[in-house]
C-alpha cells in the first residue's frame, strides 16, 4: 500500500515495519467485522428457521387432529368411497346437483364484506363463503371464495367452485378435506429440510472469532 511504498523510498525500516503492522491490523479488523456480520446473519436465519419449524409442527398437529375428526365422522359407500354429506342452509335436498346449483348462486351473488359467512356444513365442519375485492385487468370485482373450516380453513381450487358443473361444485368441500394428508406431507417435507439446516446454522452461530 501507499505507506509501505513511502517507507521503501525513505529506506527507513522502522517505517516499513510500522506500515506492515498497520496493514495487518486493518486486515484483521476487516476479518473481525466480516466474521461478526456472518455470525449475526446466521443467528437471524437460525431464529427464523426455528420459528418456522415450530409453526410447521403445530400445523401438522392441528391438521392431523382435523383429519382424524373427519375420518371418524365420514360415511362411506359399499366400495369405501366417502359420501358427500354436505348441507347448505335453506336447501332440504341431499341431491348433489340441487346443492351445487344453490352453491353456484351463492358464488355469483354473495356479498359478505370480507367476513367469512357460514352457509352450511360437512361432517360437522362449517362451510363458509367470503367476498373479497380484487383486481383483474385493471378492473375491481368481487371474488367469492369458499372454505371448509376446522383448525384451519381448507380450500379446493383456491376456494373457487366449478361454475359449469353443479355436482363438482357440491363436492368442493369434500375434496378440500381429502387434501389434508397431502398438505401434512408438504409440511413434514419442509421440516425434514429444516432439521438438517438448523444444526448447521447452530454451529456457525456458536463460533468464536479467534
Predicted regions and their residues:
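Detector for Asparagine
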Residues: 1, 12, 41, 56, ...
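Secondary-structure junction/capping motif
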Residues: 1-5, 90, 94-96, 158-161, ...
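Short amphipathic alpha-helical segments that mediate assembly, nucleic-acid/protein binding
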Residues: 2, 18, 96-100, 167-170
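Long, largely alpha-helical accessory region at the distal end of helicase-like NTP-driven motors
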Residues: 2-82
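Generic structural signal of hydrophobic/aromatic residues within well-ordered alpha-helices
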Residues: 5, 67, 99, 103-107, ...
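Acidic-enriched, low-complexity/disordered segments with a strong bias for Aspartate over Glutamate
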Residues: 12-17, 41, 66, 77-81, ...
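Mid-to-C-terminal oligomerization/interaction "stalk" domains of large proteins
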Residues: 19-38, 45, 114-210
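Coiled-coil termination/hinge junctions
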Residues: 49-114, 207-210
Amino acid at each position: 500500500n501507499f505507506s509501505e511504498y513511502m517507507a521503501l523510498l525513505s529506506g527507513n525500516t522502522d517505517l516499513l515495519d510500522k506500515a506492515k503492522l498497520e496493514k495487518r491490523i486493518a486486515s484483521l479488523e476487516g476479518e473481525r467485522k466480516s466474521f461478526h456480520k456472518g455470525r449475526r446473519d446466521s443467528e437471524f436465519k437460525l431464529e427464523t428457521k426455528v420459528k418456522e419449524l415450530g409453526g410447521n409442527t403445530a400445523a401438522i398437529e392441528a391438521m392431523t387432529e382435523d383429519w382424524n375428526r373427519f375420518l371418524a365422522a365420514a360415511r362411506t359407500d359399499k366400495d369405501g368411497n366417502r359420501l358427500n354429506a354436505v348441507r347448505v342452509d335453506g336447501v332440504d335436498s341431499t341431491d348433489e346437483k340441487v346443492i351445487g346449483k344453490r352453491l353456484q348462486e351463492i358464488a355469483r351473488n354473495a356479498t359478505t364484506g370480507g367476513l367469512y359467512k357460514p352457509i352450511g356444513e360437512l361432517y360437522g365442519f362449517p362451510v363458509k363463503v367470503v367476498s373479497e375485492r380484487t383486481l383483474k385487468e385493471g378492473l375491481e370485482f368481487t371474488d367469492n371464495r369458499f372454505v371448509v373450516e376446522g383448525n384451519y380453513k381448507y380450500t379446493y381450487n383456491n376456494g373457487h367452485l366449478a361454475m359449469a358443473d353443479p355436482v363438482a361444485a357440491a363436492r368442493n368441500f369434500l375434496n378440500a378435506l381429502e387434501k389434508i394428508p397431502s398438505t401434512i406431507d408438504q409440511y413434514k417435507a419442509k421440516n425434514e429440510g429444516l432439521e438438517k439446516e438448523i444444526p448447521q446454522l447452530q454451529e456457525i452461530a456458536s463460533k468464536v472469532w479467534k
